[in-house]
């Protein structure tokens, strides 16, 4: 199903936004075997993901996500990329807490560790935060407290289609960047 896209990537050619959107849509709809997903993700990583590919991937993600509604404006999201390879502490979560304490409105987006030592969800869970709160609770926290945690599996349920392959690859892929640029429509 992704053969044409894989061929382009292996030829060091960038996929167009429409091509990438189609590829990600098929992946997230569960239409593509994991081996094929892995081959394309690794090929894109080796070539270097392009802006056009990230644009297409963000479009696909936004079409399939659960949005968060808020009355707040000027939101900050400190979503990290995960997988820094150096086993550093989770600075994006610490940044979210400090920024909110300083008065910023923060919609912290994140997940459990996939390719890093700790994910935001791991850190917050250890601190006693209910990371899998309903969307209405997340929205109320943001509106009333000025900070919330947007747990990726609840806002991006289709990502479960690529979770196993991402873990098996054990290296960051374009999905690590989508959290930063394709946030929960807050």
Locate each region found by the language model.
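Acidic, glycine/proline-rich low-complexity segments that act as flexible tails and inter-domain linkers
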Residues: 1-87
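A glycine-rich phosphate/pyrophosphate-binding beta-strand-loop-alpha-helix module
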Residues: 41, 89-145
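Self-splicing inteins and homing endonuclease
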Residues: 58-82, 135-165
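General beta-strand structural signal in soluble alpha/beta enzymes
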Residues: 77, 106-110, 131-134, 149-151, ...
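Acidic, glycine-rich active-site loops and adjacent beta-strand->loop/helix elements
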Residues: 80-85, 110-116, 155
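A generic local secondary-structure boundary/capping motif
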Residues: 111-113, 137-139, 160-166, 171-178
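Short acidic/polar capping segments at secondary-structure boundaries
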Residues: 112-113, 129, 154-157, 182
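Conserved small/polar residues in nucleotide/adenosyl-binding loops
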Residues: 184-186
